[in-house]
Structure formats: C-alpha cells, structure tokens
Amino acid sequence: MIEVRNVSKSYGGQAVLDDVSCVIPAGGITSIIGPNGAGKSTLLSLISRLQPLEAGAVSVAGLDVAATDSRELARTMAILRQENHLTMRLTVRDLVAFGRFPHSGGRPTVEDLAKVEESIAHLDLTPMADKFVDELSGGQRQRAFIAMVLAQDTQYLLLDEPLNNLDMKHSVEMMRLLRRLADEFGKTIVLVVHDINFASCYSDTILAMKDGRLVHQGSPRQIMQQAMLRDVYDIDIRIEDIDGNRIGVYFA
C-alpha cells in the first residue's frame, strides 16, 4: 500500500501540488489521469523520492520514503521517469542490466542475467538486445527503459507516461503486460497516463487530478462518467459501453 499524507510542492512560489492525500491499494493497477499541469508527474516523483518532500509524508509498503535507505527503497519500488537520457553509449542488454544493480551491487549472478534476458523478451527486444540504445527508434528506446524497470523486479512499479512514443500495437501490449504483472505476480503498478480509455480498460483504481489537487478517486466505472470527466477536463466526453468497458469519445 502507498500512503500519501498532506503532500504539497511548489516551484518558484507556484503551488504544483496542494495538500494531496490518498491511499493507493496494494496490488493491481492504479492510473493517474488529468490535464496537463495537474501535478500527476510531480506526485509520482515525490512518491518515488526523485524529488524531496516540502510538506507531508509518503510511505510505500510501510517504509517512510523520506527516511529509508536508498538501496532498500530500490528493492521495493522501481520508477520510470517521463524523460530518460543516457550519458554513455550502452546496448539494450547493458541498459536493462542496470535494473539489477540494487540486487547485485554491480556483480550480477546467473539469476540476475536470467532476469535481464527475461525482461528483454517481455518487451519484444531480443532481436535488438545487442544494438546501441541511441540507434533505436523512440518507441524501441521507451520499451528498453521499461525493460530496465521490469528487470529491477520490485513489488511496486511507478511509471510516468509509459506509453510515450509507443504505437497502438505496442501500447496495447504494454498495458496487457502490466495487467499480467498485477494479476499473476501480485505487483502494485502506478502509472501516469493521458489516454483515459487505457486507464478505463486496464486499471483497478483511477486517481483524477486537476490544478494540483486530487479531485476524484474510484473504480473505472465510477470515474468514467460524463459529469465527472467534465469536472476534470472541462470538455464534454461521451461515454460508451463497449465489451463491458466504459470508453470516452472526445474527438468528435
């Protein structure tokens, strides 16, 4: 379980998060949705300690995020940033192997190497495992970074816009993989996603943010309602039921 208590954050005197509190249940997929500037990525970065807390507290699996040893935290949760940059030239396999560092300390075992290959295969990257990351397309690079996070093999996965640069096929495959990790391996997955229909079809819980506040939290069927989405996005979104899922139609 992830507990966020009265968390606030500001940049240059401008509030980005304003007294946010929530409980994210253990297990399953929780999607964070909302318009640009809502504070979604900032919330995820505070949960993962990529940024320091200014006010409030965060705990993950009972661990105080602000006080827990970095290596212990890295064995508990893995984070995919929205923007990822490399300062050295690495192959896909080398990059994914970094995900094992919290476990191996830089001395990978046979088990570590097997986990690397398994993660590469999960993201359909085996044919390009020996290619340099800077030779890949944007979507292939995104999958390589996600494979690195997957190789970390933590109970909690925090993913900031994991569908960036992915085409329709790989977006669906990514969400199916995350669903499988939650259902078969008991992972707790928290992701920022802009496509409300992916959130609706694959999530157990949705957090809706706006103007630095958490404005709604509930199941997809609770959140995917016209009045509620209008409150979040300030546009009218028609809701259709398709194969048991609520789908938002907002482009017509």
Model regions: which residues?
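Helix-to-loop junction immediately C-terminal to a conserved catalytic motif
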Residues: 48
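The feature captures the beta-strand-to-loop junction immediately N-terminal to the Walker
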Residues: 33-35
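Conserved ABC transporter NBD signature motif
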Residues: 56-64, 73
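Conserved ABC ATPase "signature" region
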Residues: 97, 110-128, 158
